[in-house]
Amino acid sequence: MSDLPFTLDQLKIIKTIHREGSFKTAAKKLYISQPAVSRQVQNLERQLNTPIFYRDKRKARLTETGHILVKYAEQILSLCEETCQALDELKSINSGTLVIGASQTTGTYLMPRLIGIFRHKYPQISIELKVHSTRRISWGVANGEIDLAIVGGEVPPELQGTLEIISYAEDELALIIPQAHPFATLQSIQKEDLYRLRFIALDTQSTIRSVIENTLTQSGIDSRYFKIEMELNSIEAIKNAVQSGLGAAFVSVSAISKELELGILHWAKIEDVTIKRTLSILINPKRYYANPIKNFEKEIMEILLTSAASTNNP
């Protein structure tokens, strides 16, 4: 390819003239003389062999060539700024701020441990953890508000072609009941017994609830006929409600390990029914990721994959 007919300085000048509307104002904005601005434009017009501006006393207006030039000048200069930012971030490989997203269960029971391990290795990196529904977190990653996320459940269909979804493990959902419930004496219950229970449920927008309903439907159980006593948006609140004898609930096994160990809650196994959801890491492939984010992704992938392997091969 032959030498380019323009320089970055010339593109910046053309862009500024178009934005400010005159050579004089552009010169002031760029802290150079007006003759220097005019000379650069003339040199570029001579190089391209076509005018870039219609010149009149009121305003510098772009020609068709000028419009094309400004359009690509904005993209080129933006990429140059992004390149400079990336190079600057190389100097601070182990510092910066990460915004990590997580759905309710992963944010409450998994992320604190992962963040603790990461912060021990990279103490200079600040981490902001946002815990919301899978849908809200997914949109946060897509919009650039969240750098990386770990979620359970299905990513919104409209984002599945936009985000990179790295599935790393399955999370089993358990039916929990109070220790004093008659079903707690049984080795397992029949799926039809679910209609006899009173349920404490997550709100209808929860991905956990969707997974439960879909799995039960495939097993011939219509959850629309369940007795829903109340809906809560907190796993801890649901566990406390079940412990208090207010009903039964489906929650992630990872959220009840302590309660099962202490005998506070009972995991009621359902014969011929196993409910699982996929845990995934979400990133936006269109974004530039600085080193702190790359480091975090690498570290948690190693931890999560190792943990998943040990769980599947006890």
From Swiss-Prot:
A Pfam family that the UniProt record links to this protein: HTH_1
Q: Which UniProt keywords apply?
A: Chloroplast, DNA-binding, Plastid, Transcription, Transcription regulation
What does UniProt give as GO cellular component? chloroplast
Span of domain HTH lysR-type: 6-63
Its recorded name reads: Probable RuBisCO transcriptional regulator
Q: What's the family?
A: Belongs to the LysR transcriptional regulatory family.
Originating species: Emiliania huxleyi
* MF-aspect GO terms: DNA-binding transcription factor activity; transcription cis-regulatory region binding
The superkingdom listed in its UniProt entry is Eukaryota
Described purpose of this protein according to its UniProt entry: Trans-acting transcriptional regulator of RuBisCO genes (rbcL and rbcS) expression.
Q: What CDD domains does the annotation carry?
A: PBP2_CysL_like
Question: InterPro entries per the record?
Answer: LysR_subst-bd, Tscrpt_reg_HTH_LysR, WH-like_DNA-bd_sf, WH_DNA-bd_sf
Q: Does the keyword Chloroplast apply?
A: yes
Portion annotated as DNA-binding? 23-42
The entry's localization annotation reads: Plastid, Chloroplast
